[in-house]
């Protein structure tokens, strides 16, 4: 009888351990599935800001009238047979602080016309190019489609397999955007007075390898005058971010300020984000 009792007791203890173990695992699963996870928001904001900085480098290069003596060097290679030119922005092999960020490597632009001319087509790739020690890879295509119905210059921006290699992992993005130049079109050699309204959508992967999609639900205002005091130029607008394993997040870019503060909204709860 005593032996039977001990066996029953042992079975009961083992059963309790197993039940407790599975209960703990269930709780861990629930804890790990953080419904307030903002990884997709952080990663999209980083790659968005990287694209904006590259676009600024391209605009800055196009308004330069001659090759500079200091880094970065602007090198133009003509190809008469194809009616295309190549513009290389060369920062060198070591980090160089330019337009607010550390850069090294090359940005390579193949183009057929000046940036602000109707029909201009710019295809941009990279050679060992880093921004703030993050390796940038992929392709950007910018097309000037001429004047729209509002008599403003309109651009189409295609993002093709853009990768940002960070210390935490790789961020990937593919997207299509429309950029309307609503102010500054009359002074094509002074890009800091440009204001764009931007709409579009994209899909990508975060550093945690979870996929996401984004859609601009209220046009983003790109105020390039903000470059005078900040590296953040989006002063208002709304973006919907939809990670594959979480619910919708809303990015609210603010109220016309040239700051780097953005609100991520999840089910009416607001979480401040700061980009730099």
Model region roles, listed by residue range:
Residues 20-23:
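C-terminal motif of bacterial Sec signal peptides marking the signal peptidase cleavage site
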Residues 2-11:
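Bacterial N-terminal signal peptides that target proteins for export
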Residues 25-276:
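Low-complexity, intrinsically disordered segments exposed to solvent
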Residues 14-16:
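Hydrophobic alpha-helical targeting segments used for export or membrane insertion
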């Amino acid at each position: 009888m005593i032996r039977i009792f001990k066996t029953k007791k042992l079975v009961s203890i083992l059963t309790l351990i197993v039940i407790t173990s599975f209960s703990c695992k269930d709780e861990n699963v629930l804890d790990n599935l953080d419904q307030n996870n903002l990884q997709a928001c952080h990663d999209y904001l980083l790659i968005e800001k990287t694209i904006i900085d590259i676009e600024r480098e391209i605009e800055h290069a196009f308004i330069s009238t001659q090759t500079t003596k200091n880094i970065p060097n602007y090198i133009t290679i003509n190809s008469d047979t194809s009616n295309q030119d190549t513009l290389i922005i060369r920062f060198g092999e070591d980090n160089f602080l330019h337009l607010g960020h550390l850069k090294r490597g090359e940005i390579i632009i193949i183009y057929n016309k000046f940036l602000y001319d109707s029909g201009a087509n710019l295809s941009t790739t990279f050679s060992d190019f880093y921004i703030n020690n993050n390796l940038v890879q992929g392709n950007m295509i910018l097309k000037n489609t001429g004047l729209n119905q509002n008599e403003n210059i309109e651009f189409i921006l295609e993002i093709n397999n853009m990768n940002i290699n960070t210390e935490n992992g790789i961020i990937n993005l593919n997207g299509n955007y429309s950029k309307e130049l609503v102010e500054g079109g009359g002074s094509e050699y002074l890009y800091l007075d440009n204001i764009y309204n931007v709409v579009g959508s994209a899909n990508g992967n975060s550093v945690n390898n979870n996929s996401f999609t984004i859609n601009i639900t209220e046009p983003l205002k790109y105020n390039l005058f903000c470059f005078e005091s900040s590296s953040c130029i989006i002063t208002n607008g709304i973006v919907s971010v939809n990670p594959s394993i979480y619910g919708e997040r809303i990015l609210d870019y603010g109220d016309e300020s040239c700051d780097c503060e953005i609100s991520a909204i999840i089910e009416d709860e607001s979480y401040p984000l700061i980009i730099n």
